[in-house]
From Swiss-Prot:
Subcellular location field: Virion
Source organism per UniProt: Enterobacteria phage T3
Function noted in UniProt: Structural component of the short non-contractile tail. The tail comprises six fibers made of gp17 trimers, 2 nm in diameter and 32 nm in length. May attach to host lipopolysaccharides (LPS) to mediate primary attachment to the host cell.
Renumbered residue ranges of the record's region Disordered: 187-249
Biased composition, class Low complexity, residue ranges: 221-234
Entry keyword ATP-binding: no
Biased composition (Polar residues): 187-197, 235-249
Major subcellular site: virion
Assigned protein family: Belongs to the T7likevirus tail fiber protein family.
Quaternary structure note: Homotrimerizes. Interacts with tail components gp11 and gp12.
InterPro entries on file: Gp37_trimer, Phage_T7_tail_fibre-like_N
Source species taxonomy: Viruses, Duplodnaviria, Heunggongvirae, Uroviricota, Caudoviricetes
Entry protein name: Tail fiber protein
Gene this protein is translated from: 17
Length: 557
């Protein structure tokens, strides 16, 4: 009965399928070896390259295919012969389950050995050795007639055959030469028939020998061609055998490495078992601490490690609680006060002491509830502030201001505005607004009390009468005057609109034209229209009526 291999199975890779069935039974996942076959044999690592989706199915983390250089995937069971799942000790209880596991492990090892034997050179139904289409490598040269012949020996034989063929061809060429010479002799021996006949006979004999040599050479050529074909097939078989041998060697090395790794793991597990103090039901008590290089997952409703505990319920009004503390009191805890989905105002951090922070940013609001105060404390000789609730008002209270006094200063970094609270007054560095009133830094005051004017302007306009002082800036020539129309002259002092002792009543064109109306009891009323231009240096009498100017004076301001 032919042996059917059960512990090794290969699947074709198509670049899309990632799930493959495991057709055989196994005792532990570490006994299942997954290998990609293509440009090389790539052994995959569990969790990194694949995982067990179910007990009978693996799922690759990547869909491999011919584009990656791999065409098939091999699932092989390699049960450890050193990592015993059951280790019997004197005085232990002998259970059927343990015996079955030990027996199954032994059966698995035997089954894998049988499959490994079936996967190598075997005997076919006729009793002949069968290499199963693979190469036989590292084969010695044949000695006896019934020995297997390596490809190198065949190549040597082929070289000898080719040499014989070449020699036969050389003999044939020489025979052709002899025949040609015979023909020449025949033509030249017209007068000597006897000699010619003799030469002809010799030539015919040479021709027969040449034909014999040609036939022999043809046989050699045919034999050489057959030898070349056989040598080529032998070369292919030898290369296949070499590849299989390399694969077998690599597989053996991998098995040895895995056996060594499993032995190391078994040693680690034995050491781990030695660190267990006792077991109580599903609980495990360790002799020492537990150190985890990665994340530590714990199930059920929480855990307690002495100075830190976490639980997810079991106490009214407290859910998802994390507490830090000592045996008699908890120093800090974070909890969700109500079992709801709401997060805002439902999370609280309680600290039974001071919070000392070296730095950091707070992105959310800081709320003080139940009348508690916020203390901003620095060094003993520096500013200390307290934000507390006084009645219905929130007040800033200062315990100490600067190094030498108790002043409290509020400063705007952007606007450069300062407000300093002294014991009995306040100091500001810019205008101070009180309602609709404004107090300037020079002492001036503006407000509705003064008609929205500054106080100095209001007093000047209402109560103060100034004595006007004038300075003459132009005079007409002696015994002459300027009539209306187009008279002009130059002032010796620049005049502008602020120095006229006049009120402008009209503007004509682009130049300022001022009209002076002189009040009088005589009729008609006298008036003067004039213009100052050229940056206040040129006076022009545009028109006048009974008021020709003789001089111009400006107010001293």
């Amino acid at each position: 009965m032919a042996n059917v291999i059960k512990t090794v199975l290969t699947y074709q890779l198509d670049g899309s399928n990632r799930d493959f069935n495991i057709p055989f039974e196994y005792l532990a996942r570490k006994f299942v070896v997954v290998t990609l076959i293509g440009v090389d044999r790539k052994v995959l690592s569990i969790n990194a390259d694949y995982r067990f989706a179910t007990r009978t199915t693996i799922s690759l983390t990547k869909a491999w295919g011919p584009a990656d250089g791999y065409t098939t995937i091999e699932l092989r069971r390699v049960t450890s012969t050193t990592d015993q799942l059951v280790d019997f000790t004197d005085g232990s209880i002998l259970r059927a389950y343990d015996l079955n596991v030990a027996q199954i492990q032994t059966m698995h090892v035997a089954e894998e050995a049988r499959d490994l034997t079936a996967d190598t050179i075997g005997v076919n139904n006729d009793g002949h050795l069968d290499a199963r289409g693979r190469r036989i490598v590292n084969l010695a040269n044949a000695v006896d007639d019934r020995d297997a012949v390596p490809f190198g020996q065949l190549k040597t034989m082929n070289q000898n055959s080719w040499q014989a063929r070449n020699e036969a061809l050389q003999f044939r060429n020489e025979a052709e030469t002899f025949r040609n010479q015979t023909e020449v002799f025949k033509n030249e021996s017209g007068t000597n028939a006897t000699n010619t006949k003799q030469w002809r006979d010799e030539a015919n004999g040479s021709r027969d020998e040449a034909e014999q040599f040609k036939n022999t050479a043809g046989q050699y050529a045919t034999s050489a061609g057959n030898s070349a074909t056989t040598a080529t097939q032998s070369e292919v078989n030898a290369e296949n055998s070499a590849t299989d041998a390399d694969n077998s060697r690599n597989l053996a090395e991998q098995h040895a490495d895995r056996l060594e790794l499993e032995a190391d793991k078994l040693g680690i597990f034995n050491g781990l078992a030695g660190r267990i103090d006792k077991g109580d039901g599903t609980n495990v008590y360790w002799k020492g601490g537990i150190h985890a290089n990665g994340r530590l997952y714990l199930t059920s409703d929480g855990f307690d490690c002495g100075q830190y505990q976490q639980f997810f319920g079991g106490s009214a009004g407290r859910y998802s609680v994390m507490e830090w503390g000592i045996e008699k009191a908890w120093l800090m805890h974070v909890e969700r006060r109500e079992r709801t989905t709401a997060i805002v105002d439902n999370i609280q951090l309680v600290v039974n002491g001071h919070i000392i922070a070296q730095g950091g940013d707070m992105t959310g609001p800081l709320k003080l509830q139940n009348g508690h105060a916020l203390y901003l404390e620095s060094a003993s000789d520096k500013a200390q502030y307290i934000l507390s609730k006084d009645g219905n008002r929130n007040n800033w209270h200062i315990g100490r201001g600067s190094d030498n006094n108790n002043d409290c200063t509020f400063h705007s970094y952007v606007y450069g505005t300062n407000l300093t609270l002294k014991p009995d007054y306040a100091v500001v560095n810019k205008r101070f607004h009180v309602g609709q009133a404004v107090v300037a830094t020079d002492g001036n005051i503006q407000g509705t009390k003064w008609g929205r004017k500054w106080l100095d302007a209001y007093l000047n306009d209402t109560y103060v009468k100034k004595t006007m002082a004038w300075t003459q800036v132009w005079a007409a020539a002696s015994d002459s005057y300027m009539g209306g129309g187009s008279q002009t002259d130059t002032l010796h002092r620049t005049c502008d609109s602020a120095t006229y002792g006049l009120r402008p009543e009209t503007t004509i064109g682009t130049s300022s034209e001022l009209v002076l109306t002189v009040s009088t009891s005589f009729q008609p009323r006298r008036w003067l229209k004039f213009q100052i231009h050229s940056n206040g240096r040129v006076f022009k009498n545009i028109a006048d009526r009974a008021a020709t100017p003789t001089a111009i004076a400006v107010e001293d301001v």
